[in-house]
Amino acid sequence: MKTILDVNNLFKSYGNNIAVNSVSFRVEQGQVFGLLGPNGSGKTTLLGCITGILLANQGSFSWFEGDEFTKARLRIGALIETPNFFPYLSAWKNLEIVAKIKGCEHSRIDRVLEEVQLLDRKNDEFKTFSLGMKQRLAIASALLNDPEVLVLDEPTNGLDPQGINEIRNIILQQKAKGKTIILASHLLNEVEKVCSDVVIIKKGEVLKSGKVEDILNSGKRLELAATDMDKLWISLSGMSGISNLQNRNGFIVAELNEDMNADFVNKSLQDSGISLNHLVLLKADLESEFLKLTQQ
């Protein structure tokens, strides 16, 4: 698979404050690649570095397997933080200005407005738009040059559920068209629903990276109950391959290592004279993995 972006030991600081600390990752063609981290984790700074807005102190990055950066930028559409539009100009007129700056044909304007479902509002002034519509117009501006890659920084920040869903659908539609998307977000649900791959960042450092599916499958947990809960707790505590026991809503929740499974646990407990009246394999979620990593 073709490598779209290769980041190697990127480091960026502001005086004594380290924003990005030796970050490395690789984005492959067709991925929706998530940068997940709490506010202040360095996501925006990292995106600023790889799009040429900021200059890193150390490390390197390359686009499209070593393509010259000035050429590579023409193949990238980026939305970093809040875009600036003229409030008294229409959506079409605002995009016309962006098209002139980017050297894009005006025929692209109606096309991208349709892609973000704003074609019927193209003659309305920007100041009349809702926050969600403003964000969709910003994505339209990033799509004007028909880029191979979209770089989006917190595209659903501050939006209501409907606005979030609209942006999510646009991202998935662009993925279906073959675009590679790099998405920075602090919203776990957003990354879990749209991203194929993720890097989890805290204080500028990578805590974990990989396929979202693999990260979800790595955190197997069991929810158990028996008539004698104290005896069950003691037995589970002494069982290898089980950790992080918790009492939750009248059940015991246990984390399993990769080699452990529910059938083995059930048989081992039966051999110890414990009959379970409740045994459920819990679906892992990105939130639990994220919280576990960021609280370490």
Short names for language-model regions:
Residues 66-67, 103, 227, 259, ...:
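Short, surface-exposed acidic/glycine-rich loop or hinge patches that mediate macromolecular interfaces
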Residues 112, 126, 249-250, 282:
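Residue-level "edge-of-site" marker
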Residues 257-296:
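C-terminal coupling/interaction segments
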Residues 168-256:
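ABC transporter nucleotide-binding domain
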Residues 5, 12-183, 188-202, 208:
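ABC transporter nucleotide-binding domains
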Residues 105, 119, 242-243, 275:
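Short coil/loop linkers at secondary-structure junctions
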Residues 1-11, 296:
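ABC-family P-loop ATPase nucleotide-binding domain
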